[in-house]
Amino acid sequence: MAVLTGLFGFFAYVRGAVSQRCFSTSGSLSAIQKMTRVRVVDNSALGNTPYHRPPRCIHVYNKSGVGKVGDQILLAIRGQKKKALIVGHRMPGSRMTPKFDSNNVVLIEDNGNPVGTRIKIPIPTSLRRREGEYSKVLAIAQNFV
């Protein structure tokens, strides 16, 4: 009987130790960083052809390594490396920056010109402050939020 009580005490101890550990199984709601899946929202041929793997960010061109709206990133898309501009992300941003349902990017060339000719979703008006850098991207946008 004493052995049985000792075993139950041990199992209660193990169960209590395991249940006290806290770990999350949900994904973090951060902005765009390395290996983040993104959605291409322009009408470029490279971004709209179906492929079995979604495009992923492989580098963020800023000091912190976390991309926000208006930052440039390097994508791995269909076995190629392409630059892209972030036009929306899921993480809640600063004031007057909308939160989107997905991480949206527009493919750009090395000189900053957009690859596509139309952007399918509304883009944030906060990009208008940087109009010198991204004036051609703003020109092909149809809606602003």
Curated annotation (Swiss-Prot):
- Please provide, alphabetically and separated by semicolons, the GO molecular function terms listed in this UniProt record: structural constituent of ribosome
Q: Where is the transit peptide?
A: 1-30
Q: What's this protein's name? A: Large ribosomal subunit protein uL14m
| Coiled-coil stretches noted in the UniProt entry, renumbered to this chain | none
What GO cellular component is one of the record's annotations? mitochondrial large ribosomal subunit
Q: What does this protein do?
A: May form part of 2 intersubunit bridges in the assembled ribosome. Upon binding to MALSU1, intersubunit bridge formation is blocked, preventing ribosome formation and repressing translation.
UniProt similarity note: Belongs to the universal ribosomal protein uL14 family.
Quaternary structure annotation from Swiss-Prot or TrEMBL: Component of the mitochondrial ribosome large subunit (39S) which comprises a 16S rRNA and about 50 distinct proteins. Interacts with MALSU1.
Q: Does the keyword Endoplasmic reticulum apply?
A: no
Q: Which domain of life is it from?
A: Eukaryota
Q: State the organism of origin.
A: Rattus norvegicus
Q: Which UniProt keywords apply?
A: Mitochondrion, Ribonucleoprotein, Ribosomal protein, Transit peptide
ATP-binding recorded as keyword: no
Kindly list the biological process annotations in GO that this record carries: translation
